A protein has these predicted regions:
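Bacterial N-terminal signal peptides
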Residues: 1-11
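Sec/Tat signal peptide C-region and signal peptidase I cleavage site
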Residues: 10-19
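N-terminal secretory signal peptides
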Residues: 21-100, 166-170
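Short, structured motif recognition centered on aromatic/hydrophobic residues
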Residues: 41-46, 107-109, 119, 123, ...
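Short, exposed beta-strand/loop patches in secreted or surface proteins that constitute
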Residues: 68, 129-135, 141-143, 152-154
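Long, charged/polar, surface-exposed segments that mediate recognition or autoinhibition
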Residues: 86-138
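Long alpha-helical, hydrophobic tracts
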Residues: 111-116, 137-147, 169-172
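Short, exposed beta-strand-loop hairpins at the edges of beta-sheets
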Residues: 142-159, 163-164
Length: 172
């Protein structure tokens, strides 16, 4: 699976922790939510993508699917995340999607993380082996080292918004 998804500030912290003021949550709140919605087919992939997009953060999220037939439709989650690490101390947002395709499931995640520094300075946080992949309408695109997906670095004044994109699928 994807380890850091493109930013070094996520490396090394594998489990999300509940917020101090929040009531006790299961180890994986997204797994609990899809279970409550009756999602079984893509639940494991969705949960893994959710844990990956939120790696190293305190987070909460909302999950949606077709209530009448949850295993016949995609499941979508939106997450709000707070990071408190030496390299990154800010908020971020994520979107996770898992959809049945035949007998398996495929999914994607997107994370949006603003940095209060120039994009040229954020480049050093990309995983080793990351390479430039061109530009999309002037927005730099990078293939992340370790086959961890892609990242776009969007300049916003003196800040840089990192948009990380990755795919996942059931294996086996």
């Amino acid at each position: 699976m994807l380890a850091t998804l493109g930013t070094a500030f996520l490396a090394g912290n594998v489990a999300a922790t509940p917020q101090a003021a929040a009531p006790a949550q299961p180890a994986n709140p997204l797994q609990a939510q899809v279970g409550q919605l009756g999602v079984r087919k893509c639940a494991n992939l969705f949960s893994a993508l959710g844990q990956t997009v939120a790696l190293g953060s305190d987070y909460s999220g909302q999950v949606q699917t077709e209530k009448a037939a949850p295993d016949a439709h995609g499941v979508v989650g939106v997450l709000g995340m707070t990071y408190k690490t030496a390299a990154y101390n800010s908020q971020a947002a994520g979107v996770v999607v898992a959809t049945p395709v035949g007998t398996k499931c495929e999914g994607q995640l997107v994370r949006v993380a603003p940095f209060q520094r120039a994009c040229k300075d954020v480049l050093a946080l990309l995983p080793a082996g990351s390479t430039a992949a061109g530009a999309l309408s002037g927005v730099p695109l990078y293939n992340l080292g370790g086959n961890q997906g892609q990242a776009m670095l969007v300049a916003s004044g003196n800040a840089c918004v990192v948009v990380t994109i990755a795919r996942g699928a059931d294996i086996g």
